[in-house]
């Protein structure tokens, strides 16, 4: 897990994306609005990103929110995380 005190939600999501891209041999950081599929992430990578977001932010993404549109860009993931954090308590607590 990344240090939550050291970074914003967008930075934390961007780092998760960067790590997934690096595993695919892609050394570039997409902007907040870049399409992650076009940046090099596969559909399996997006599923892994969903799991990583749940772990990083200690939350559960409801099935209704597991839509490709919510994971199209770093900005959209950040918005989803903010929405979920506003309406729920952490999984561990």
Segments the model singles out, each with a brief description of its role:
Residues 2-41, 45-51, 55-93:
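Phosphopantetheine-dependent thiolation modules in NRPS/PKS and related acyl-activating systems
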């Amino acid at each position: 897990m990344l240090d939550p005190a050291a970074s914003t939600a967008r930075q934390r999501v961007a780092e998760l994306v960067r790590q997934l891209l690096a595993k695919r041999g892609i050394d570039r950081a997409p902007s907040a609005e870049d399409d992650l599929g076009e940046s090099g992430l596969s559909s399996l990578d997006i599923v892994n990103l969903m799991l990583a977001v749940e772990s990083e932010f200690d939350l559960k993404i409801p099935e209704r929110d597991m839509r490709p549109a919510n994971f199209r860009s770093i900005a959209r993931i950040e918005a989803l995380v903010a929405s979920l954090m506003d309406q729920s308590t952490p999984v561990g607590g």
